[in-house]
Amino acid sequence: PAQDSKTWLNPERAAPGTAYEYNDSRVNVLALATLNIWRRPLPQVLKEYIMDPIGASNTWRWFGYDNSWVLMDGQMVQSVSGGGHWGGGMFINAYDMARFGYLSLHKGKWKGQQLLSEEWFKMATTPTPVKTDYGFMNYFLNTDQKALPSAPANVFWHLGNGNNIIFVLPDQDFVVVARWLKGDGMDGLVKRVLEAKQ
């Protein structure tokens, strides 16, 4: 937050769809709203509807912050965060990342079962008017080929804390998982993968 609390507490407002600002608070509010819709811990929902159907391991974890407990239906439930810092977030191995990437590659379908709707997937990978390299949440897009000039415009990636990345290359029917990759190394890695696939 800004040092000036008046600026932080009363930020300038922009009309929806006219501005972009990376901010975990909005993700955490979305997580809390989603928790209120499902009325049960979101890690349970993710496990039942996504992770178990894609055959994920039992080692992944999704934690909330220590101070993110809420009273729901007479029980204390942790509202999980979207980010992997300050003690919260998702912790996932490369194997499970690849499986999630494969689900994304196939537009939410896993072994013939549609786990995420194609309509949702289309929205998630549609560039926003204000930031053409960003879709929903952690769907980063190569629309203008600025981040990955060596890759086609339809390549996208999921980016996690520490530059843990799932690259999805639809034309090649291929997923690449990279762990702790420096940001400036992304294009070089994808370029080498594309060259190796030819």
At which residue positions do the language-model features occur?
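Sec/Tat-exported extracytoplasmic proteins
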Residues: 24, 34-41, 49-58, 94, ...
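Active-site Gly/Thr loop motif
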Residues: 68-84, 88, 126-175
